[in-house]
Amino acid sequence: YEISACLVGSEMCIRDSTLSEPGYDMMIGDKTLINCLLEPIDASVGLLSWSTTNDRVATVDADGLVTAVGAGEAEIIAQDPLSGLSASIAVKVVGEGVVSLSLSYVRNQDELKALGWGFGQTPASVNFDAEGMTVNMSLQSNSKYRADLKMASNDRPVVLNIGTYRYLAFRMDVPGNGSLKLDTNKGDYGNNPTGVLAEDSQVIYYDLQAKPYFPTDAPSDKLTTFQLKIADVTVQPYSYKVYWVRTFKTLEDLKVYVEKENNK
């Protein structure tokens, strides 16, 4: 919308605002900063009042940072308190059939275990920081290093909806060599990922439809084995760092997500 510029005391009304949707379905635990273009250009996002129509689905803070807290749909509203005019976007949060975890929000192995995640072999050490999780792998009896990343357990099984969310992506610093094998109790996806994102070499992804393990027209069975086997490492670094793990509908959605993450 367009309205005339106005001054109230020393405060300026915003005469135009445009909010950009995330560009992908959000998942529980996701955080995204809504891109807001304002006119006049010297107007500040701090002038806006933010709200949500459903705080059980998504919350929003004073800077326009949206946090997905539950499955469903919500509308995020940015309003200029002086003029009363507003702009809004729709946000969809998916609860089942997906995988989503930012390791920057995990502080220790107890929290990781509470999420149903863990390791196939006991690592030499695991360190958490504001960016993610660094795993120092353990030496095996074959004189090679290994530490599989487990993303499911008997207590916290995984259900996949690969008909809709086809791609599983990891942002990670991989070890010096060895193999990366995505494995489930239905079968594995080979020794290497489907591809590496051209726009960001730290992002590897798997096409979950590449093997006929799961239906594409219905959710999968509950998986208690869902892991990335990281093995046979013989050159340094004997470690890997994971920033986030997530499923996506399309590679374009993945690219949009990566661009937003890189521009934080």
Protein language model annotation of sequence segments:
Residues 1-14:
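Short, small-residue-biased leader/transition segments that mark boundaries at the very start
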Residues 10-11, 86-95:
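C-terminal edge beta-strand
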Residues 17-45:
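Solvent-exposed, low-complexity, repeat-rich "mucin-like" stalks and linkers
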Residues 40, 80-82, 232-234:
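Surface-exposed loop/turn motifs at beta-strand-loop junctions within extracellular Ig-like
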Residues 42, 47-60:
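Short, solvent-exposed loop/linker segments at beta-strand-coil boundaries, enriched for Pro/Gly
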Residues 62-74:
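Extracellular/luminal low-complexity segments enriched in Ser/Thr/Pro
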Residues 72-84:
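A short beta-strand micro-motif common to beta-rich folds, especially ectodomain repeats
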Residues 95-264:
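Beta-rich carbohydrate-recognition modules and glycan-binding surfaces
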